Amino acid sequence: MSYEKVLQAGKIVIGTKQTIRALKEGKAAEVIVAEDADLPIIEKVMAAANEANVPITKVDSMKKLGKACKIQVGAAAVAILR
């Protein structure tokens, strides 16, 4: 289900740094994180999302999340922008 959200989203940012930046700037409407990503990376993104009061959705695979973003590599985090 969340993979479809990414596919249908108008604007997204891909990657932990860009996701955290979007959260700090108040541009993220929702954050999607891959559960198979490194825990310290996920924790940073989730902490930023909680601080910004943005909903977090977890998916099982970085590879599938990357594919949903139409990139050839895995993605640990994606932000759907407002």
UniProtKB/Swiss-Prot annotation:
Source organism superkingdom: Bacteria
Keywords tagged on the record: RNA-binding
Entry-linked InterPro entries: Ribosomal_eL30-like_sf (IPR029064), Ribosomal_eL8/eL30/eS12/Gad45 (IPR004038), RNA_bf_YbxF-like (IPR023460)
Gene3D superfamilies: 3.30.1330.30
Gene Ontology terms, MF aspect: RNA binding
Any Pfam family hit: Ribosomal_L7Ae
Disulfide bridges in this chain: none
Protein family per UniProt: Belongs to the eukaryotic ribosomal protein eL8 family.
NCBIfam families, A to Z: PRK13602.1
Name of this chain's protein: RNA-binding protein GTNG_0100
